[in-house]
């Protein structure tokens, strides 16, 4: 007869010993608890503001995960594709500026048509003139230079005329005045079209050179949006973008909403702001779930298994007859389209298109931290990483201020060290991201929700 061990027995498991499903549920429950804590300790308006950007960040992280987690493509041009999504919001939803179209719309169309025709003609001559020897270079150069001169001669006077039309309020062509939700799809199309061009040029490069190429092209896209005022107002920004949810002032003017705010014992302004944020959260959740479902379906399909095989061993996949370059281009376009959708959603949440806010190095780093920390190759991991990293990106400042206030509470209020630490605490965001990344890589190198073994 065996003797029972001394002391009580326990069946509790550490998070690392849990089944993957239990562990994932625990992680998402912890994320929800963090958002609830913000609502209780700060305000629900702040909590839903963070939640909305977490949802957009999760969609953007899914786009990067499609490229890197599925195919191993190192895309550092994330902000360029997000900016194209933002441009789609302007082009689709803003009303057209009739005076600007009358002043130079025809010239812009003719200039763009000339530029496209020049590119097509140059490509055709380059491909078909392989037997021409040196004349091939000369003919291509003549076509490109003459086409460029003709394009500028048509477009430049029109650009000047458009930008002179009430530059304080417009100074650009405006948009099509279509429903705002449509811009989310168009944002994906814009980003996908740009990704196709970028992919045709750069996907033959090795990973490190591909990263440099995508970063450079992203900078070019943002540079164009900053300085082509006729298209996007440049650094003057486009304000007052339509949005798919009610405006706060409209809610505040309704008697039923006033009664609802009184019932909830909330100030009218706070209640209207909260309802608008909840509406955004519902819309963004629908989009996130749709993208997540499509991503999971693709990942579990034969195509998804083929992409993972290409990622793990390109040489073997190529030897088995798979067109690696074609599949890389496809997955690059799909991931960029998802990023473009997220970019279009972001400008609708902000209500303005600000080209200067797209900082490739800073925010591309943030999206990559989301994917790496959440779990590369796992869609649920990308979603969790999007939520977790954006939450701490926003909350790093108040947490840092509170921590420094506690640490220096024993010092006089005017002590130089206390003042210095309190002033510096607001700039701990990047350090916080680095600490989170190091902790994840140390204790869970494959991410919080790693790619499942198949």
Feature annotation, model-predicted:
Residues 2-454:
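Transmembrane alpha-helices and adjacent helix-loop boundaries
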